[in-house]
From Swiss-Prot:
InterPro entries: PS_antenna-like, PS_II_antenna-like_sf, PSII_PsbC, PSII_PsbC_sf. The keyword Protease does not apply. It is a multi-pass membrane protein. Gene3D superfamilies: photosystem ii from thermosynechococcus elongatus. This is Photosystem II CP43 reaction center protein.
Amino acid sequence: MKTLYSLRRFYPVETLFNGTLALAGRDQETTGFAWWAGNARLINLSGKLLGAHVAHAGLIVFWAGAMNLFEVAHFVPEKPMYEQGLILLPHLATLGWGVGPGGEVIDTFPYFVSGVLHLISSAVLGFGGIYHALLGPETLEESFPFFGYVWKDRNKMTTILGIHLILLGIGAFLLVFKALYFGGVYDTWAPGGGDVRKITNLTLSPSVIFGYLLKSPFGGEGWIVSVDDLEDIIGGHVWLGSICILGGIWHILTKPFAWARRAFVWSGEAYLSYSLGALAVFGFIACCFVWFNNTAYPSEFYGPTGPEASQAQAFTFLVRDQRLGANVGSAQGPTGLGKYLMRSPTGEVIFGGETMRFWDLRAPWLEPLRGPNGLDLSRLKKDIQPWQERRSAEYMTHAPLGSLNSVGGVATEINAVNYVSPRSWLATSHFVLGFFFFVGHLWHAGRARAAAAGFEKGIDRDLEPVLSMTPLN
């Protein structure tokens, strides 16, 4: 469909290239973008852009289903999940599927069902994506005005924003319903070493929930990443889901105020940049969450956190040397500080040695040994249970270090053990991807602002190597 207005008016960004190549009628002449600019050619073709997005969703869901089944096929129930390089099954186990006391996997069938459901969904999405990319209407405005839009239409854009917020709110409530009514979720803090339980006593106090947002992000405080009980996590999802749904209704029913109309750039590329910025923030927060938090990401499935492995090693050697007759309360280490125990700056009794920097750690296997002033010496002498020794020895030897140099005193393996913790994978990948998304946010924000100001002419492509090559067609 040849558009009626001058594209240059809407695309001050010129992309110079071999303009003769036409791909399915969406060539450079009609769109202002060459074939390699991908979906930019579809900016004003709402029907085709829908196809691209649905097909992309299909690819995502296909990966989830296929990877899920791959992990099920390779899963060995006798080994912990974190020893098997799994990144999807730990998420399903955390939601309470297939696991029992202590995080032991008792049934892999729910995991199989999850994989199959995702595969079937991906087929539906894939069909829809191909249909809308190849067969469906190029634009939706004429035939399906509810689904059509113009990027400059501020009211329509905030309506779409509202619909998205409502869907996110429903997603948050799905976790709430799973925890409250549909079998519960895995609680690493359940007495006796973790179990699946229904959450009955939600934390809905705004001072507690929003108190997390007001905390310092630094050690001992840890902002929202410091959440360490499921009541707060599920209660937070009630608040978040409610805010998203109410905000969604608000954005559907209202038009942007004058200050908002002035403050934002209202173009497709601007919305892309806002979305990328939000995803970058999500990525950075997820990175910190999976690295430091052992409640939302239980160590039974993801392996210990770095601080947890370090403290576990200190605990393991305290147990060993105490059995050999050491007086762990008074033994002096090579620095003159306590070898096994010392005091934190605020007076608590903490583990000595290099792990002192991780004295904030809270973990289910360690908390029973604490008293009102930190670690309780009499409990360390009389109350250590075999399950605590086993778990700390296991965590000590499965630190999520990769090849870090600063390891909190953990004895590292150089060439014997082939082990990378899922925490390392998930934290690193989310940091790196979050950073890429942040760069994309800056790039597209700059282009969108320049285009809105009317002075962006694109990159000078006179020396583009591709210009000297034979045209593809």
